[in-house]
Design a protein with these regions (language model features):
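Long, low-complexity, charged/polar intrinsically disordered regions in eukaryotic proteins
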Residues: 1-3, 9
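N-terminal helix-turn-helix DNA-binding core of bacterial DNA-binding proteins
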Residues: 8-54, 75-81, 89
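Basic amphipathic alpha-helical segments that dock to polyanions
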Residues: 55, 59-62
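Beta-hairpin "wing" of winged helix-turn-helix
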Residues: 63-83
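Amphipathic alpha-helical dimerization/coiled-coil segments
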Residues: 90-117
Length: 117
C-alpha cells in the first residue's frame, strides 16, 4: 500500500488506517511505545532485525502521521526520545481487538496442527 493511501479521503476508513500502520515494523513499534517513551536504541534492541535506517524511516513516517512525538534534548550525549501521541494511543487501542483476533487465529492453527498429528 502506498503512503498516499494514508491521506486519500476517497478510501474506506479501514484502508486509511492500515495505510498508516503498513509495513513490517510499525505495529511492533506502536506496541513497544505503549509501555512508555523509548530512545531509538532501546527500540532497536527490543526489535531484533530492525535496522537503524528502517527504524528511522518508520519513526519519521509515524511522526508525520501524528502517531508519535519526537523529543530531542539539548544535552551531550544527544538524547532523542519517542512517545505515543494521544492519536497514537487511540490507534493502539483500536488495534487491540485485531490483536485478540490474531491470538485466537494462532490458537486455532496450533489446535489444527495437534489434531493432524
Amino acid at each position: 500500500m502506498t503512503r498516499s493511501r494514508a491521506r486519500d479521503t476517497d478510501v474506506c476508513g479501514v484502508t486509511a488506517a492500515i495505510a498508516v500502520i503498513d509495513g513490517k515494523w510499525k505495529t511492533l513499534l506502536l506496541w513497544l511505545l505503549e509501555s512508555g517513551p523509548h530512545r531509538p536504541g532501546e527500540l532497536r534492541r527490543r526489535a531484533p532485525g530492525l535496522s537503524e535506517k528502517v527504524l528511522t524511516q518508520a519513526l519519521r513516517e509515524m511522526e508525520a502521521d501524528g502517531l508519535v512525538h519526537r523529543e530531542a534534548y539539548d544535552e551531550l550525549p544527544l538524547k532523542t526520545v519517542y512517545s505515543l501521541t494521544p492519536f497514537g494511543r487511540d490507534l493502539a487501542e483500536a488495534l487491540e481487538p485485531l490483536a485478540a483476533w490474531g491470538h485466537r487465529r494462532l490458537e486455532r492453527l496450533v489446535e489444527a496442527e495437534r489434531q493432524a498429528l
